[in-house]
Structure formats: structure tokens, C-alpha cells
Amino acid sequence: MKTKRSKATDIPQSVKKKVWERDNHCCVVCGMNGYVMPNAHILSRAKGGLGIETNIVTLCTDLNPNKCHSKYDNGTKEEKERIYELIEAYMKSIYGYSWSIKDQRYKK
């Protein structure tokens, strides 16, 4: 049985579809459109990142040479910071400057 937090951090198919359209079927970091998926939490699930449209972006999978999702999750500190800055700028361009990472966290 899933906990409330686990359910809240899952990404429903409806959210993936909205994100896929919002991101124009492309990685929001490098712009590639092959081997990309709308399933990357900006604030990670481990940190309570919600599975909502404002916390999910489309990034390259490991099949894409750029591997943006892998670098964002497992890269060097510098890679993670650079990718986060690009994602943050993108999200603010979509949702306005009121978009904040702190609003993407699960709250009890």
C-alpha cells in the first residue's frame, strides 16, 4: 500500500501528457527531441518533490547522447547546478517569476 507521500510524488499520466505538450516534446535543457521523456522531477522525489506539472520537466534519457536527466540526477555538483539553473529559468519563463522550488515539496 502506497503512503500519501508516495502517491503525491508519483507522476500521473495526465501530468506527463501536459508536460510533454508544454515542453514541445523536447528536452528543456538541450533542446533535443529524440529519446526524451516528460518524467524528471525538478525537486527530487527523495526530497518530497511532487508529481505535479510545475515540478516535472522533459529531459533526455540515457539513450540520448546528452543524457541530461542522468546528469541532473547523478552528475557532478557543477553539472547539477548548471542544469538546475537552466530548468529554473525555463520554468519561470512559463509560470512567471513567482515559480519557486520550495512550492514543489510535499507537505503533510
Language-model segments: what does each one mean?
Residues 1-17, 24, 31-36, 81-108:
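A boundary/linker detector
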Residues 21-24, 54:
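Processing junctions and N-termini across compartments
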Residues 26, 38, 59:
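The −1 position to Zn-ligating cysteines in a subset of zinc-ribbon hairpins
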Residues 32-35, 56-86:
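Short Cys/His-centered divalent metal-binding micro-motifs
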Residues 43-56:
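Short linker/helix segments within small regulatory modules
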